[in-house]
Amino acid sequence: MAHLRDTGHNYQRPSATNGASQINGDVFFTPGQDPLNQLPVVHEASHDSAEKQDDPLCLENTRAQVQECIYSWQKSDGDDRCIFWLSGMAGTGKSTIARTVAHEFQRRKCLVASFFFSRGSGDSESASFLFTSLAKQLATRRDTATQATSSAHIALQDALREALRQDPDVIRKSRQEQWDKLIIRPLTCFSAKLQDVSTTTSAVLVIDALDECSNENDIKGIIRTMARQQLPHARLRIIITSRPETLVRLEFSDKRNILHSSLSLDDVPQHVIDADLARFLHSRFDAIRDHQEGLTQDWPGLHTLNILLRRCEGLFIYAETLCLYLEEDCQHSHSRLQTVLNKTTLQGKGHTTALDDMYLTVLINAFKNLSKLSESEKDRSKDLYDHVVGSIVVLQDDLSASTLSYLTQISQFDIMAILHRLRSVIKQSGIESPITLLHETFREFVSDQRRRKSYEGG
């Protein structure tokens, strides 16, 4: 199942408080307990969580213009617009950019907190613990503290503790109250302590894939809450990424303090995107050559690279899926690449994009030996695929293989065999590890009967 959030403090029945005192309603504190431990946290939603340690960052010298735009905005004293909206179609690399800038701001000693929404990932798709998670991260980040800012960080912690003592039920109250009491007031104290310190230190909140929040009212409410007022005294910068969905776009359109007009990844010149994609592919192809003898130094060649760049259609997720597909069986990388190159995207023939072609190629290759099976074995293999992949897509939760086995009554061996065949589009590292999709576009592909018809028909 999804990772259980760390509530730090349990709401207890009066009969089970073991001497704890009751403060304001039904929230109990044990004497000597740090109020910060009361804050519910979705650990896996943070950019530096264990679950995200293998997620990619931008390759050096790629997406440089977009990153520089963000960094320049963050350190500009003359720009009081505190929110930066980075939009782009699915697969354009928004989450990778968000992870990269979060790590870079942390390296620059900014106070960084992040929340990466993820559809189908339990607490990570809900906004219920967004502000409490961000507040806890701001209060407990120790790797960014310097001698000049340590007293300011202590002031932030003290302000947050005091807010929780004064109103322990704030974690159950409106998002506006949580925002004001858990984020803005502590950050205002943080900034006040820095007034006499010569530093450009600021707090940076990174909220990725807001459109993947499961509740549309929460999406609107989050934007309205954060954009309601100018925040010059909080030294706060907020980066939000999302697809350019109508709901999100309309919420941003009438907020003058939101910097977003020229920050769509879809507006980046094609030659810039292609240059970044070429660097990405060159780097990954170099690694493949290192693991497979017999490939020439210029493999796969400039002509092939240009074909692949056209197939990418500006989507980094296509390039990532292609490389994972080639890397999962390095001894057959060349033949797999030829299979991809020989496939022609057909408009209106059951799928419509090169990315669909890539997903179809992965599925067809995963089950290409079905022709050698008996009819009953073929039917069983297809049923296993339908039940395993269908459950992962429909249940929309980070299930482990053991939990999925319990729910579907399919053996762990069969589940792991299916997942192993699909490891270029489904991430899974062990029986008890969460199963996650490489990208939300694969869920959308599998869920669209028209787009997957070519595979099912074959």
Regions found by a protein language model. Give the residues of each.
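Conserved NB-ARC/NACHT P-loop NTPase core of NLR-like innate immune receptors
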Residues: 2-458
